[in-house]
Amino acid sequence: MIPGEIIAASGDIELNAGAPTVTLEVSNTGDRPVQVGSHYHFAETNAGLSFDRAAAHGKRLDIPSGTAVRFEPGQTRSVTLIPLAGKREVYGFRQLVMGKL
């Protein structure tokens, strides 16, 4: 073993196993690309994105931590969302929640 070396287990690692999911169609109605990070409260994303915000309340993208999804102008795509975990408190973003979900 080399100091600092990380030896990962063999096989695939399933992310967010067992988390309930919801799939939404999202359209970028704006004239600029919008990028949304893995742990951003999806309901509070850029107003140029058109989707069912009530269905996205308390949820984030089901993608690996530290990654993002980019929506080009005029683009429509499906995204899968999972519930925010932990204390389920949301602060900042667009300041639409500022507390418990």
UniProtKB/Swiss-Prot annotation:
Pfam families per UniProt: Urease_beta
Enzyme class per UniProt: hydrolase
Pathways involved: Nitrogen metabolism; urea degradation; CO(2) and NH(3) from urea (urease route): step 1/1
E.C. number(s) listed in UniProt: 3.5.1.5
GO biological process terms on file: urea catabolic process
Keyword field: Cytoplasm, Hydrolase
The name this protein goes by in its record: Urease subunit beta
